[in-house]
Amino acid sequence: MSRIGKKPIPVPRGVEVTITEENRVTVKGPKGTLSQQFSPEMLITHENGVITVARPSDDKRHRALHGLTRSLIANMVTGVTEGYQRILEITGIGYRAAREGKNLVLQVGFSHPIRVTPPEGITFEVLERRSANEPQQVIIRGIDKQKVGEEAAKLRALRPPEPYKGYGIKYRDERIRRKAGKAGKAR
């Protein structure tokens, strides 16, 4: 049995879970509603405030789907109760971020500012720098873990951190492998 798949998912108070015949799971909580279609082969049950996922057989495909389905449902429950966030840091001379309404405006070394419109369910927050040599932080929040991660990856891809001075957009917990600059001329 899958170690991840066999773990039951506790449903906190204030969270409603509905499971249809076609295995569409809808989770409604204080932060919003998430709905996702799962493989009809998986056996998903909701009893006594606990969601359990079972598989019909032990073939490789069912073992893989078992843990995946359980993890995705657990992420949905966490998303509608606590939500998810990713923090990006913008480092570089003249690199900055600002909000215009819901949109995010980035100045990251291009000849023009880049405007990013958040998809539905995603919000941006820009924290002001406390000092000039501290990186500026952008927080991406939402209830769907996949959407939050995808939007963070798209923003990071606009200007990935370069290895010499570390300028660019990176995740807060990311470590950049730095390179030494070229050696000076010997006289």
From Swiss-Prot:
The keyword Cytoplasm does not apply. One of its GO terms (cellular component) is cytosolic large ribosomal subunit. Keywords: Ribonucleoprotein, Ribosomal protein, RNA-binding, rRNA-binding. GO terms for biological process: cytoplasmic translation. Transmembrane segments: none annotated. One of its GO terms (molecular function) is structural constituent of ribosome. InterPro entries: Ribosomal_uL6-like, Ribosomal_uL6-like_a/b-dom_sf, Ribosomal_uL6_a/b-dom, Ribosomal_uL6_bac-type. Coiled coil: none annotated. PANTHER family: 60S/50S RIBOSOMAL PROTEIN L6/L9, LARGE RIBOSOMAL SUBUNIT PROTEIN UL6M. Belongs to the universal ribosomal protein uL6 family. This protein binds to the 23S rRNA, and is important in its secondary structure. It is located near the subunit interface in the base of the L7/L12 stalk, and near the tRNA binding site of the peptidyltransferase center. Part of the 50S ribosomal subunit. This is Large ribosomal subunit protein uL6. It comes from Roseiflexus sp. (strain RS-1).
